[in-house]
């Protein structure tokens, strides 16, 4: 699912919580129903909502990163290389603006209004779509940490 989330979890485990767990790839989400004491899982996307409240502890990676570094975290960034046709970068900016302005319609069109969680609230209150200097500084810190975690994938 998200290599960034896997690496961020590795950073937090090593640098913030100062633990060195063994990592395994989750082969099947059914394993979550048979967790042993001491087991921990990284869940991403809709799976977070599907399993919410089933475990004694849960942590939001971005919130924990902010506690540890006092910086926001950017899980994804839209970028264009230097020299790219300005029409393309303008098109990316237009698509971003359109998406932000039509979030509610997208939630309805894709059936997320029928989910047991507030998809619109999540998309409008939990995600910041502007890449600013603080997020750039945070990404530099993250990249420079050198943390590499294996396995790098979850089922999905």
Regions found by a protein language model. Give the residues of each.
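Short, flexible coil/linker segments at or flanking structured domains
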Residues: 1, 11-14, 29, 66-68, ...
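Bilobed "Venus flytrap"/periplasmic-binding protein-like clamshell domains
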Residues: 1-33, 37-39, 105, 137-140
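Long, contiguous hydrophobic alpha-helical segments, chiefly transmembrane helices and signal peptides
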Residues: 2-13, 41-44, 74-78, 123, ...
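Generic serine detector
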Residues: 2-5, 20, 58, 145, ...
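Short secondary-structure boundary micro-motifs
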Residues: 7, 61-63, 113
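Pocket-lining segment of extracytoplasmic ligand-binding domains
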Residues: 25-109
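Secondary-structure end/capping motifs
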Residues: 84-145, 149
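Conserved C-terminal helix/tail region of periplasmic/extracytoplasmic solute-binding proteins
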Residues: 151-156
């Amino acid at each position: 699912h998200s290599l960034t989330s896997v690496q961020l979890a590795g950073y937090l485990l090593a640098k913030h919580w100062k633990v060195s767990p063994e990592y395994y790839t989750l082969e099947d989400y059914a394993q979550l129903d048979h967790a042993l004491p001491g087991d921990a899982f990284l869940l991403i996307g809709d799976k977070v909502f599907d399993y919410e409240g089933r475990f004694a502890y849960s942590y939001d990676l971005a919130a924990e990163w902010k506690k540890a570094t006092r910086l926001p975290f950017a899980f994804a960034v839209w970028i264009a290389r230097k020299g790219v046709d300005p029409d393309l970068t303008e098109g990316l900016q237009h698509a971003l603006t359109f998406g932000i302005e039509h979030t509610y319609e997208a939630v309805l069109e894709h059936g997320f209004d029928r989910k047991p969680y507030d998809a619109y609230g999540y998309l409008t209150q939990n995600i910041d779509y502007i890449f600013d200097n603080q997020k750039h500084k945070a990404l530099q810190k993250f990249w420079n940490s050198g943390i590499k975690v294996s396995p790098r994938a979850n089922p999905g």
